[in-house]
From Swiss-Prot:
Chemical reaction(s) catalysed: Hydrolysis of DNA containing ring-opened 7-methylguanine residues, releasing 2,6-diamino-4-hydroxy-5-(N-methyl)formamidopyrimidine; 2'-deoxyribonucleotide-(2'-deoxyribose 5'-phosphate)-2'-deoxyribonucleotide-DNA = a 3'-end 2'-deoxyribonucleotide-(2,3-dehydro-2,3-deoxyribose 5'-phosphate)-DNA + a 5'-end 5'-phospho-2'-deoxyribonucleoside-DNA + H(+)
Record's keyword annotation contains ATP-binding: no
Subunit architecture: Monomer.
Record: residues binding DNA: H106, R125, R168
Main function: Involved in base excision repair of DNA damaged by oxidation or by mutagenic agents. Acts as a DNA glycosylase that recognizes and removes damaged bases. Has a preference for oxidized purines, such as 7,8-dihydro-8-oxoguanine (8-oxoG). Has AP (apurinic/apyrimidinic) lyase activity and introduces nicks in the DNA strand. Cleaves the DNA backbone by beta-delta elimination to generate a single-strand break at the site of the removed base with both 3'- and 5'-phosphates.
Keyword Manganese: no
A UniProt-annotated Pfam family: zf-FPG_IleRS
Alphabetical keyword list: DNA damage, DNA repair, DNA-binding, Glycosidase, Hydrolase, Lyase, Metal-binding, Multifunctional enzyme, Zinc, Zinc-finger
Gene that this sequence comes from: mutM
One annotated GO biological process: base-excision repair
Name used for this protein in its record: Formamidopyrimidine-DNA glycosylase
Zinc finger (FPG-type): 259-295
Listed Gene3D superfamilies: 1.10.8.50, MutM-like, N-terminal
Length: 297
């Protein structure tokens, strides 16, 4: 599943085609994706201008001139094919490089825009979805209600980590993946951040706050490296796992900077470390870490 940096890469790739343009025609190849499409979906979009395109956690949000917001989630294999006004074809977030003929049968929603662009949503597994909600109710809609703070920007800090994790016995990795606490973090970047912070993934989350609820040095460092890892991954265009490529057809490059993720049995890359990357399973997900750099405490 694409994580925050990959979704941000898709957002940046879609922005030139969508923002400022109106939907002139919406074609639906089927009435549902993971969930049924909203009632009168095409009619509610047609003629509306896209005022802005933002990201919340792993969701894309298009603010419309009608006062509604179009929420889009890529699921496991969702992708967008874009024909720009100048005729160039790009794919801002391409996970499955199949032949064009085989891929076309998975084109489910197509948006024709007033600027001449065309945006097509393709989803092999059909785990993605789209919804329309009043923009004023985004924070309380069923997709975002109860969602945690954003890991990029000013919300995430050592103080926030201590406040969110205080008293929790949950393993640190599981707490970081809990979207009710911090929204948008996924398996890849949590493994990488924990390694940079030299924290064992099974450390009780509550250990990052002292008895008075103040952040420990580890909490401050963890907040810092989470931002660093995500910022670097966005700059690299995300991580290519299987066949992910971004807007201009090139692949994301952050996988070349992985320190532990998917490196089981390989030497730890930390300077002076002679440890080997291990893999364990936590809550059904693979966790990669170095026992030397990240000792259990």
């Amino acid at each position: 599943m694409p994580e925050l940096p990959e979704v941000e890469t898709v957002r940046r790739g879609l922005e030139p085609a969508l923002v400022g343009a109106c939907f002139s025609h919406v074609h639906l190849a089927r009435p549902d994706l993971r969930f049924p499409l909203p009632e009168r979906f095409a009619a509610r979009l047609t003629g509306q201008r896209v005022e802005a395109l933002s990201r919340r956690a792993k969701y894309l949000v298009a603010d419309l001139s009608s006062g509604e917001a179009l929420i889009m989630h890529l699921g496991m294999s969702g992708r967008f094919d874009v024909v720009l006004p100048d005729g160039r074809q790009v794919s801002p977030g391409d996970f499955y490089l199949e032949g064009a003929g085989a891929r076309a049968k998975h084109d489910h929603v197509s948006f024709a825009l007033s600027n001449g662009a065309r945006v097509t949503y393709n989803d092999v597994r059909r785990f993605g979805f789209m919804d329309l909600v009043p923009a004023a109710e985004l924070a309380t809609c069923r997709h975002f209600a109860g969602m945690g703070i954003e890991p990029l920007g000013n919300e995430l800090s050592g103080e926030a980590v201590a406040r969110l994790f205080r008293g929790r016995r949950t393993p640190l990795k599981a707490a970081l993946l809990d979207q009710r606490l911090i929204a948008g973090l996924g398996n890849i970047y949590v493994c990488e951040a924990l390694h940079r912070a030299r924290l064992h993934p099974e450390t009780p989350a509550g250990a990052l706050a002292d008895a008075a609820g103040r952040p420990t040095k580890a909490a401050r460092l963890l907040a810092e490296v989470i931002r660093d890892v995500l910022t670097e991954a966005v700059a690299a265009g995300g991580s290519t796992l299987r066949d992910y490529v971004h807007t201009d057809g090139t692949k994301g490059a952050f996988q070349h900077a992985f320190r532990v993720y998917d490196r089981e049995g390989l030497a730890c890359t930390a300077r002076g470390c002679r440890g080997v990357v291990r893999r364990v399973v936590q809550s059904g997900r693979s966790t990669f870490f170095c026992e030397v750099c990240q000792p259990a405490r």
